[in-house]
Amino acid sequence: VKDISVKWRIILSLILTKLTDILLSAKTTLPTLLNAVGAPSWMLGLLVPLRESGSLLPQALMGAWLKNKSDRQKPWLFSMVLQSLFIAMMFLLPLLLFPYMWNIESVSCAAISGFIILASLSGLSLSRAMTSLTMKDIQGEHLRKGMRGNVVGIASTAAGVLSLVFATFSFFSSTMNEQILLVIAGGCLFAMCLSILILKNIETKVDADNDSDENTTSIKDKVRSYIETFSGDLAYFILVRSCFVHTALIAPFFIVWSLNAYPQNTLVSLSSFIIAQGSATIVSSYIWGKLSDYDARLTMQLGALIVFIICVLLLIVIHFDFAQSLPPISFILCYFVLSVGHEGARSGRKVYALDIKVGAQRTDFIGKANTSIGIVILLLGVFYSAISFAGNFVLFSLMAVGLAFGLIISFKMKKEKS
């Protein structure tokens, strides 16, 4: 009974955290917030890197710090409180405090508001990195193997429902004004506080790694030892995950290509793609989660294989110029299948990272992997943006090659349940 209670408390906390992620989308809410305060347009380009890679890059350093510590509850609570403070700063200072201090129409007020939003987002991402690391250990210590994928699946399904609700709310609101932004801020703060209350009494201790003597090891030996950890299980996981990042990277290029193919069609719209993605999450997440509990590596492979097959079909359509002869609904269905595949790769990756190591080793493993992937996402994003002029055929070809390479080397990955 205790295990069931802990399981559902963790699920509720994950759902609330995912709700906050949805509400603080770098594609909708945050650009609208910058626009509402009149911030310079160049700041828009910093939102996604700060929001996504900003929460991944510091995890290796954080993991190294956590490695010699056994308590995970206090760092998690501290990071959640910090996130709440940065959310409050991000919305309340520019929308409520600054208008009383300066002329809201002034350039200086707009610039300062923009910098406060970006600084708060940076702090939020750093705090989120610690939350992510410690939550993995909370899941790993309180949920046995065979239950973790189920938890991820349930939380993702609920997040899919919430994303549909939020998308519908956004679509029916022709403008996201300051009042709605403040409601979103209030919703995020409520979700964070409730999540803290749900898990604050769940004590989590892991076996600290105190084998190495930090005082007698030279800096050179420390660097060599650190580099050597990027081998074996971790090396294959990072390499495969770097290839499978294409399951997510393909989405924006596919959407833009579809919108350009049918620019005047109301069915092929951003709202349709958001609904397709949310529906895919609802339909597939629980199934992927259950499969991950059986074999997380296989789940990653199947998800990536689905996206690879869609990539090949897209290449055929582009090469023979079939796009205009296809019914518009086929683009939405295609994106639905892409989203199903991405959910599989994502679910398998999460459970694999939880199951392959234990205790402080898990913290170190996940931290280094996430930092590496943060760098990979930035580099691939810059690379694909730089070669976008080459056309969709070249882009999708490179992504298909990346997925194929990842599928081949994924068989070198150690089975996490063995």
Predicted stretch roles:
Residues 81-110, 306-324:
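C-terminal ends and interior cores of transmembrane alpha-helices
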Residues 128-143, 343-357:
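Intracellular juxtamembrane helix-capping segments at the cytosolic ends
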